[in-house]
Amino acid sequence: VDEKQNRDRVKQDTIVKDFENWAQNKNIKFDGLRHEQFEFLGSKIQGIKALGKVDAGKQLVQLPKKFTISTYVSEKCPFPGWISNSFWDKQPNYIRLALKLLWEKKLGENSAVQAYVDLLPDPENLDTLYYWTDEELDLLRYPVLKNSVLRQRKEWDELHKQLVSSSPGGAEGAPAPEELAWALGCVLSRAFAGARTGLQ
């Protein structure tokens, strides 16, 4: 294990500990779960481990709504000085969530969910197929999958162009292409849909 890997592991351990302390202080309940490093294909990946048997229907996590990043179809744009209302109104929920995630990242220490945002992987540590080179995709020998990735890249590039052209601050105010791709990747691998009833 080289020095950089050791530094990265110490940094990740600190981020996880800070997140867990923040969650407990905010009355976020996750009894019976803990963060864990798992061996996967010769490397370690971060995940969640259940500390015992999980019965069907058991509630695993409970948190106040103010500590979620969420949206709904009729929601008005929460940051019209940054993203135009016309752009926001046309977007599906997963794109809205990505924009909200970027906004929280932009807020930094002023974000109510900074500890969660810090827990997300850095752009250079995302390893989804979106980030593979064309040569690496060719190694899969699965043209349908490669074409799907290329289509996603094209769609996200087009989305970014639309975002910039409709942004009140233009290119300088809008997220960079790599920032948007990072947020979309995080949302698509973590978000879920649920009923809004009973949220507080």
Language-model segments: residues:
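Short, compositionally biased
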Residues: T71-W88
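E2/UBC-UEV (E2-variant) core
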Residues: N85-Q91, I95-W103
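Long, positively charged leader/targeting segments at protein N-termini
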Residues: V1-F67, Y72-E75, K105-Q200
